[in-house]
């Protein structure tokens, strides 16, 4: 299935964004660890969260988390401390996403996790038991989800956890998010320099409501940046958000988008400012990178983006995917060191009728959709259903905002 998205005559939207996937997935684990009687409010209905809900509410011993990378990491750690024998698997892509660093760390802390097929990759067999805990070291450059997975079960280890992070720590806001949510559930950690300590202690159940997703908001910021005339209100966003991706508001200010906070959320307006070149390190906000890459080239703003190392191991190799798909639209990007992507304004002949491949990656589909605002023929996107991973109502919300969306198979 392909969608062709065409620009509205005028873009007007008041959007109820999906709940933050990052907060949902952490809150679900913490709710389970605290044996909470409370139902989490405003829980996302995206694929990743539904996979986690199903697993945590299941009496099964075998779990298929499909393409949900966060669920794979968080549940692997969670199940390692739940007495019993468990298996966890996923899609073929998931079976090629490395998990050795987390498995080694868990086993060093007293867990017993084994590989069922290829060394270092899912599927896994987990023999859950009480964990001794102790002291381990991890490279700071590993996925923050490995670190978060360990931290959330740390207070329930016999000796707690002392975690030394070596080198540059990437995605710090996601680690901070985990620690802030743990504190809301009654567990305090100490983060001094490169070391995080969590002593043995109990979680306490609390009523919890999830805030809206700043990552999802970024696509609407892109639409505002690319539009000549638009009125956009995004509901459920807070200025003092727990989410690191809230930094996108300040960054989009350099692309001409102003943010006004209200008691309902935020209102977007053109601010009259637009940088001539954008340099930024996305090490703390990797999920915003695709949105800014696509927005910048369509605004004809050269850029140099660093800190993109985690993009190589996401749903797809996002660096290669961006280069390939933007070449179809006539833009030549270069990358280096597996972590830098830049565009100096170089163009090439665009394809006559480009179709954007999404690589089973929800963020590819959502980042490219705003291109409809500047491309005369609109933009055609393959496998648009991939958005269900994090923002199931994305296309419905675009239609409500005035976009014309044509299902090319009907």
How should each PLM-predicted stretch be described?
Residues 1-410:
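Short, structured segments at the rim of ligand-binding sites
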